[in-house]
């Protein structure tokens, strides 16, 4: 099965979406935890991502493949939540 993924140059964008953040972070229960961000971004990954994979579609759908021991701050502000 071909995934049709390629590495993206995520460093070319300085807009809000390039800031490291993650809305869908999943971590293992191990110590230290192994965390992955499952967010999909258009055309690039956030600025702190070392391994970015994007589909060949236009616009590209990109996901950071890095493993960290923490989750980045959420991308969406808490003001957007309906409490």
From Swiss-Prot:
Tagged with keyword Disulfide bond: yes
Disulfide bond entries: 21-75, 22-37, 25-71, 27-35, 45-52, 49-64, 54-62
One Pfam family linked to the record: Bowman-Birk_leg
Organism: Glycine max (Soybean)
Alphabetically ordered keywords of this record: Disulfide bond, Protease inhibitor, Serine protease inhibitor
Site (Reactive bond for trypsin and chymotrypsin): 56-57
Domain of life from the UniProt record: Eukaryota
InterPro entries attached to this UniProt entry: Bowman-Birk_prot_inh (IPR035995), Prot_inh_BBI (IPR000877)
SUPFAM superfamilies from the UniProt entry: Bowman-Birk inhibitor, BBI
PROSITE patterns for the chain: BOWMAN_BIRK
Signal sequence, start to end: none
Site (Reactive bond for elastase): residue numbering on this chain: 29-30
Similarity-based family: Belongs to the Bowman-Birk serine protease inhibitor family.
Protein name (record): Bowman-Birk type proteinase inhibitor C-II
GO CC terms in record: extracellular region
Single annotated GO MF: serine-type endopeptidase inhibitor activity
Propiece residues: 1-7
Lineage: Eukaryota, Viridiplantae, Streptophyta, Embryophyta, Tracheophyta
